[in-house]
């Protein structure tokens, strides 16, 4: 009986030590990582034809989403807010078409007094041929984010690249 326990324990330890241990990745290929550098929690919804359940993104933490396809056509919008009611949101919008990702940032539904505007945000991509976005802290009219529905801020890049949206560039 003791022999069986020793063998079982040895097997468990050998298996556990063989498993790779790595910290959570900063960004993922084929998706987007959102990093919350604000001093408050943020609330996220991934919206296609319907909204996903709300996700709380604690201060100092990150959230990852692999590219989704809208089953009813059109794109996906990750809505990012400072309150749980879903109002006053910054949006990371994307549509995956084959190997391309068409994406943009939208501040249309974001008030000028939002902590997200005060903190600033940027999108970086691990493919240097791709356009990125930087909206400086306090820039209420950032030209790199949609302010009006008829703006021209949609970008395209490889869908296999790793995209990182950093919320709170001032910290």
UniProtKB/Swiss-Prot annotation:
Phenotype upon gene inactivation: No visible phenotype. The double deletion of cetA and calA results in cell wall defects and lyse during germination, leading to the inhibition of germination.
UniProt keyword Transcription regulation, yes or no = no
Extract the InterPro entries matched here: CetA-like, Osmotin/thaumatin-like_sf
Q: Which GO biological process entries does UniProt record here?
A: spore germination
Give the induction note: Expression is inhibited by PKA activity but is not subject to glucose repression. Not expressed in dormant conidia but only during germination.
* Keywords tagged on the record: Cell wall, Disulfide bond, Extracellular matrix, Germination, Glycoprotein, Secreted, Signal
Top-level taxon of the source organism: Eukaryota
List the glycosylation sites. Answer: 37, 141
GO CC term, one of those recorded:
extracellular region
Q: Where in the cell is it found?
A: Secreted; Secreted, Extracellular space, Extracellular matrix; Secreted, Cell wall
Pfam families reported for this sequence: Bys1
Kindly indicate where the leader peptide sits in this chain: 1-18
PANTHER family in the record, alphabetically?
DOMAIN PROTEIN, PUTATIVE (AFU_ORTHOLOGUE AFUA_5G01990)-RELATED-RELATED, SECRETED THAUMATIN-LIKE PROTEIN CALA
Family, per entry: Belongs to the thaumatin family.
Could you tell me what this protein does? Secreted thaumatin-like protein that, with cetA, plays an essential role in early conidial germination with a possible role in cell wall remodeling.
What protein am I looking at? Secreted thaumatin-like protein calA
Gene from which the chain derives: calA
């Amino acid at each position: 009986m003791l022999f069986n326990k020793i063998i079982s324990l040895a097997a468990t330890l050998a298996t556990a030590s063989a498993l790779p241990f790595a910290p959570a990745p900063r960004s993922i290929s084929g998706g987007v990582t959102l990093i919350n550098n604000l001093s408050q929690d943020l609330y996220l919804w991934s919206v296609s034809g319907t909204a996903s359940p709300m996700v709380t993104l604690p201060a100092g933490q990150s959230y990852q989403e692999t590219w989704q396809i809208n089953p009813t056509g059109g794109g996906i919008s990750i809505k990012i807010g400072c309150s749980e009611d879903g109002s006053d949101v910054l949006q990371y919008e994307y549509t995956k078409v084959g190997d391309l990702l068409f994406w943009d940032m939208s501040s249309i539904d974001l008030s000028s007094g939002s902590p997200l505007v005060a903190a600033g945000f940027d999108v970086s991509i691990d493919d240097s041929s791709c356009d990125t976005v930087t909206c400086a802290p306090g820039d209420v009219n950032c030209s790199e984010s949609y302010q009006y529905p008829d703006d021209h801020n949609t970008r395209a890049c490889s869908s296999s690249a790793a995209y990182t949206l950093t919320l709170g560039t001032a910290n």
